[in-house]
């Protein structure tokens, strides 16, 4: 049943080619989101959510700044801020923000220490993400790094905690157990983790 429902949703989306037609975008919205690629993709994501798409992923490239970190971020950050703020504002104005979780994250953080190429390397020990929507408490900051920014100071949360948190925000029982074809228990979120509060 679930497979058929997803297949039907995909078929419905394929009939909505108008969602992907850049000539139908409002010039005002294009300016608000930004004329750059990330802005266009975030605007498309908003339109897809309005059309009933249940999961949308938008990727922002160029953050792997092993070299020239600071110049790279000077161009990336304003684009991200512009488009992220625009989609949050639009979802709020349309009454959709209480039904949508907006997640801004990377797969890991960056080294606190600058390398020999004036860049930052991969650093999975301490990093951050931003969440909005779905009844999440606004303005909340959970956790912090130590004074050097090298490790988490206090309780650390991993992706297992994040899945519990996202599912809970969406009203999904994150302790539910699914089963694969061989009857092996497969929880939808790691059972050793819990919701971040």
Task: Give the role of each language-model region.
Residues 1-197:
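Ligand-binding pockets and gating/stacking loops
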């Amino acid at each position: 049943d679930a497979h058929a429902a997803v297949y039907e949703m995909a078929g419905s989306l394929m009939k909505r080619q108008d969602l992907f037609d850049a000539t139908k975008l409002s010039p005002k919205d294009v300016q608000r989101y930004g004329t750059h690629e990330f802005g266009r993709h975030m605007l498309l994501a908003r339109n897809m959510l309005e059309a009933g798409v249940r999961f949308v992923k938008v990727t922002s490239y160029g953050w792997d700044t092993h070299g020239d970190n600071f110049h790279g971020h000077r161009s990336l950050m304003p684009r991200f801020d512009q488009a992220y703020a625009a989609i949050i504002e639009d979802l709020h104005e349309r009454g959709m923000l209480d039904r949508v979780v907006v997640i801004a994250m990377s797969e890991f953080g960056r080294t606190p220490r600058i390398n020999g190429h004036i860049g930052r390397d991969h650093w999975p020990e301490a990093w951050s993400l931003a969440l909005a929507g779905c009844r999440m408490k606004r303005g909340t900051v959970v956790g912090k790094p130590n004074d050097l920014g090298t490790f988490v100071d206090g309780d650390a949360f991993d992706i297992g905690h994040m899945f519990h948190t996202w599912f809970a925000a969406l009203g999904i029982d994150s302790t539910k157990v699914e089963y694969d074809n061989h009857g092996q228990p497969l929880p939808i979120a790691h059972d050793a983790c819990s919701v971040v509060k």
